[in-house]
Amino acid sequence: MLMPKPESEILAQREGLLADLRAIVPGEGVIADNIALRAYESDGLSVYRQAPMAVVLPETVKQVSNIMQLCDRRQIKVVPRGAGTSLSGGALPLEDGIILGLGKFNKILEIDYENRAVRVQPGVANLAISQAVDDNG
């Protein structure tokens, strides 16, 4: 699978970007170590593998908003990732982009059995949904 060629101007921003991201999400919320990034180089579709510049793991909606504003200002590509179980290639990282890891947003908000609909946060895995509705057929 061919992916877009990374932009060298974006890659050159990496260290400054990491500092700005760490100001928004402190502690272990920014992953930039090459070995740790391997866990994020693909989703459930493992044919394509590419480590992103960084992975950011926000815990609040405000942090998500601040990250998106920062990336917009710096023209950084953002790939949102929920639980990382997709087999469709929906969360394929880019070398000159970041992964916005939304796995901490993992609540099932509403189950509407009558309309066969479930409203969830992006970090909810399909298995969790199946288990939540299993007792009601």
Question: Model features per residue range: what roles?
Answer:
Residues 38-40, 100-103:
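Short hydrophobic/aromatic-rich motifs at helix boundaries and adjacent loops
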